[in-house]
Amino acid sequence: MMPFIEIDHVDRIFPLPDGGRYIALKNIELKISQGEFISLIGHSGCGKSTLLNMISGLDKPTFGGVIMEGKEITEPGPERMVVFQNYSLLPWLTVRQNIALAVNRVLRDLPKPEQEKIIDDNIALVGLQRAAHKRPGELSGGMKQRVAIARALSTRPKVLLLDEPFGALDALTRGNLQERLMEIVQESGVTCIMVTHDVDEALLLSDRVVMLTTGPEAHIGQILEVPIPRPRHRLEVVNHPSYYALRGEMVYFLNQQKRAKKVGAVSQFAEAMGGNGLEKINLDLGFIPLTDCAPLVVAKEKGFFQKHGLEQVNLVKEPSWQAIADGIRERRLDGAQMVAGMPLALTLGMGGKTPLPMVTAMVMSRNGNAITLSKKFAEAGVKTLEDLRLKLAETPDQVSTLGMVHPASMQNLLLRYWLASGSIDPDQDINLMRLPPPQMVSNLEAGNIDGFCVGEPWNSYAVKQNLGYVIATDLDIWNGHPEKVLGMREEWVNKYPATHLALVKALLEACEYCDDRRHRQEILDYLALPQYVGTSTEYISPGFLTEYDQGNDAEAEMLLDFNQFYVKQSNYPSRSEGLWILTQLARWGYIDFPKNWVEIIERVRRPDLFGEACRHLGWPDLEGDHHNVSLFDGMVFTPNDPLGYIKRFTIHRDIQVTEILIDQIDQVNQ
């Protein structure tokens, strides 16, 4: 069903006198139903009024668009009426004449008696019959605002836009007008969008509260559903069981934004450096020998690092993901290709470690994994997840062991998700063993494990050695999931902003190169070199270039999305996807779920830096969706209720919620 109003990936950028630009709003996406009351809240300067102006047609988006009833809004119109904080009444006209001005202009085709009736009805609607012949100078502030509301409603609009309508009024008048507005909206069924700083006002009036982050590049940080039934009365709202929890969540969000550390100066500094004027040109970047290390290899071998001024990039081949994490902690590595959850895990101090604030400005690859089982399961007829559950249930005293590469890896999280969706508890019904990717096949052959979830080429290696078969690829579980990301210490990014920007640009171009299939054979030859993956192209090729053989009865087939580096906005560091990872780490007890999850996700996942790199390359500023995530079992993840999502699972560990004060962590590390 088409939404009544859709704000479709809107950016608003203002030019600056020095030739620069200020990105006020970034990637605003919101769908509004007819008759809904939406409040926009956030700190001053977050773009609330700018967004309202674009809905009204008084301003236009730089990118994206605002759609109402299937038509793009390009100019003001009488179906969208605005009520401003400053009333905007003509001082020489009476109450009646101010309202008549709107009616006579918009509804001029109606007979005069009908126009007069509309004017009278709206004066009565706001209770100003006795003041109808007074001028604005004779009215109180509250009465003036009632005139403004009556004038807006008199044109029979479909949408009422309120820009802090009660901000200048005393508390008693404000309260009375809020009650009256609720009654008017209830009677008229008009759709309302209101800008406010007052959290109590937002809760009283709204169906949903849209909370904007602090600018620049403000975006929707959280959307709060207000499940308080209508019609509402102030006392009943305050006494509702959810009122103080909702109010606390809004206040907490605003406090998070107040203390959030903003790094908007990065782009200006980077531009000022010019040319190859980077702060640091010699970098040590860690990687693991897997097929999807291709972007790093291509950036090195094809000269993308040098093109962007990074003259001395050393790719450090590490034995395990733990070694990558240790290298970052010890500052032996400047950065690394990381499993998708590692920047969050390091930031939160997963595993009892000292928290280390991290940044990821791009996803380097998507997909590329599979779940491989020992051939003994194939011989027992295990072809599906349900077959596996039944087989494991036959021998409850013999617990099978599966290998995974790192707790914060998508291999671990997707393997756990897959098992749990089949009623197999990954902590009770099976044993998960942490192993480096290159050691999976040898441990399978030795009988130390009964299967594993890992990236290529190790699944194909097991298949070709007739040691195992693939029961599922990650395309079967979550096609398009983030797999590897660029991980950097936050303090490093702040210290070397121009260098970080150059690194992201080089890797973006390398990712684009990787997803041109005409280059895949060349890249395959690079990957096979000893300093990189160091194994035969026979094992690296499946899924990357040639058909993927799962080692079962099925024919080998081309899986064009199996290794995804650039297409379909692959590189965008989606905050929704980062939040999904956070829920899974908490679901399995690896971390306490951070109470200030909005702040954590905003600090770690950095689409602003990604967008800056795209703009420097002359590319469109790609934007991901503030979207729901749905895996193969149909369970929908909604970013606005992460805790509720975890609790909907039948199998999960006890969930603890803790506040992580990231700025204090940063000071300790420095």
UniProtKB/Swiss-Prot annotation:
Cell compartment(s), UniProt: Cell inner membrane
Protein name: Nitrate import ATP-binding protein NrtC
Gene3D superfamilies: P-loop containing nucleotide triphosphate hydrolases (3.40.50.300), Periplasmic binding protein-like II (3.40.190.10)
Keywords: ATP-binding, Cell inner membrane, Cell membrane, Ion transport, Membrane, Nitrate assimilation, Nucleotide-binding, Translocase, Transport
Family in the record: Belongs to the ABC transporter superfamily. Nitrate/nitrite/cyanate uptake transporter (NitT) (TC 3.A.1.16) family.
Gene responsible for this protein: nrtC
Oligomer and partners: The complex is composed of two ATP-binding proteins (NrtC and NrtD), two transmembrane proteins (NrtB) and a solute-binding protein (NrtA).
Taxonomic lineage of the native organism: Bacteria, Bacillati, Cyanobacteriota, Cyanophyceae, Synechococcales
Gene Ontology, cellular component aspect: plasma membrane
Binding site for ATP: 42-49
Transmembrane segment boundaries: none
Chain positions covered by the region annotation NrtA-like: 279-670
Purpose: Part of the ABC transporter complex NrtABCD involved in nitrate uptake. The complex is probably also involved in nitrite transport. Probably responsible for energy coupling to the transport system.
Reaction catalyzed: nitrate(out) + ATP + H2O = nitrate(in) + ADP + phosphate + H(+)
Organism: Synechocystis sp. (strain ATCC 27184 / PCC 6803 / Kazusa)
MF GO annotations: ABC-type nitrate transporter activity; ATP binding; ATP hydrolysis activity
Pfam families assigned: ABC_tran, NMT1_2
Lipid bilayer topology: Peripheral membrane protein
Domain notes for this protein: Contains an ATP-binding N-terminal domain and a NrtA-like C-terminal domain, which are connected by a segment containing an abundance of glutamine, alanine and positively charged amino acids. The N-terminal domain is required for activity and the C-terminal domain is involved in regulation of the activity.
E.C. designation(s): 7.3.2.4
